[in-house]
Structures are given as C-alpha cells and as structure tokens.
Amino acid sequence: MPSFDIVSEITMHEVRNAVENANRVLSTRYDFRGVEAVIELNEKNESVKLTTESDFQLEQLIEILIGSCVKRGIEHNSLDIPSEAEHHGKLYSKEVKLKQGIETEMAKKITKLIKDSKIKVQTQIQGEQVRVTGKSRDDLQAAIQLVKGAELGQPFQFNNFRD
C-alpha cells in the first residue's frame, strides 16, 4: 500500500548559513554602526539569540533574521518568536526557538483534518511524524494538498513516499 510521512524538520546547516548571512547584513547596515548587536545560533538548544541596545533595533534584527531564513529556504513560521523581550541592563534580547518535529497536539489536528475530509486514507502518529497510508496515489496526493492548504502554523515536509 502506498504511504508517506508528514514531518517538520529544519536543516541546522541552513540555519547556520542564515545566521551567518544575517550577521553579514548586520555588519553592513548603517543604522547598526557603533551599536552592540549580536545574532547567535545555539545548536544544542535549537535556538537563535538576538541581542541589541533598543527594542526597535531588536525588531529590525528579527526582520533581518527572517529575511535571511527565507532566502535559505527556511519558512518564517518555523521560527517561534516570543512577543516580549528580555531586558538586561542596557541590552534587550529575544530567544527565537526553532520548531522541529510535530508535537502530539499538532499530529492530532492533522489526523482529524484528514479524517474529516473523507479522503480514503489512514493516519498513524509515529513519534514526531505522521504516517499516511492509502490504496491509491491519488488519495495520498489529495491528502498532501489538504495539509499544504491548511494553515496550521507550522511548515511540513512530505517524505518517504512509497508506492
């Protein structure tokens, strides 16, 4: 029976490249001359720390990071940006988390979405991925289009397509 897996993964190498590009853009920006501004990648925690001197500049750093990520093929909704900035002395900072894997709640939403659509496929939650199995490739492709079209707040990849 044909099947495929729905996953949510980010290539850390691409994130590293995006952070390096963002730092390069940061060094050439006129409005950041003489300002203490840093974009750091923490691969162990899967997060990016943004630090600068003002709240407005912090928002500019977020825009630079998002732009660099989009250029590297990382969707902007795979970044979990906190609404409140941390204030330490004269510096403002935000810890942007990278969304990896599908949480159980999101997997249940995907399963419910597919079952409610009456497409003749079966879904199984397997850890941080969802396996979709069906009798025909057309049903599987319809399920892919359904999940792509739904605004679930997280980017998904479809891999391991078996016939």
Curated annotation (Swiss-Prot):
Q: Which CDD domains match?
A: YajQ_like
**Entry superkingdom:** Bacteria
Q: Could you tell me the keywords of this UniProt record? A: Nucleotide-binding
Q: Name one Pfam family in it.
A: DUF520
GO cellular component labels: cytosol
GO molecular function annotations of the record: nucleotide binding
Q: Which family does it belong to?
A: Belongs to the YajQ family.
Q: What does this protein do?
A: Nucleotide-binding protein.
Q: What protein does this entry describe?
A: Nucleotide-binding protein APL_1231
